[in-house]
Amino acid sequence: MSRDVSAAATFYRELLGFETTFESDWYVSLRLGAFEVAVLAHDHATIPEGYRALPKGVIVNLEVDDVDAVHRSLAADPDTEIVMGLRDEDFGQRHFILAAPDGVLLDVIQPLPPSAEYADAYASA
């Protein structure tokens, strides 16, 4: 949910390359590959009254093929706020986190083989 649907949609389109699949003044649906995200006005009538406050503590994961290239591109943009730099995790990710509109955190991830400590935690395909 967003207090400024247009600005949030612009963030995802311009910084990350999402394409618009539906757009109105209170709702925008955006797609990047197989990933789709919707931005909805927090105060719209379709949201039950007790749930119209903007959520806090939301992190959205976005899996990419080349996290280093995405990081380079976004780090070069002075309007991008990277809140956690690029790093590898033993649990099987190379990632960084940036601030998105409305207090959302966007975790941009490229999967890596996990360490032996975490390998058994993954479900087999």
Where are the language model's segments positioned?
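Short, conserved charged micro-motifs
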Residues: 7, 67-71
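Conserved beta-strand-loop-alpha-helix junction that forms the acyl-donor binding cleft
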Residues: 2-5, 90
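Vicinal oxygen chelate
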Residues: 19-62, 71-99, 110-125
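Structured catalytic cores of enzymes that bind and process phosphorylated ligands/cofactors
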Residues: 104-109
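Acidic di-acidic motifs
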Residues: 4, 66, 100
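Conserved active-site tyrosine of GNAT-family acetyltransferases
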Residues: 8-13, 74, 103
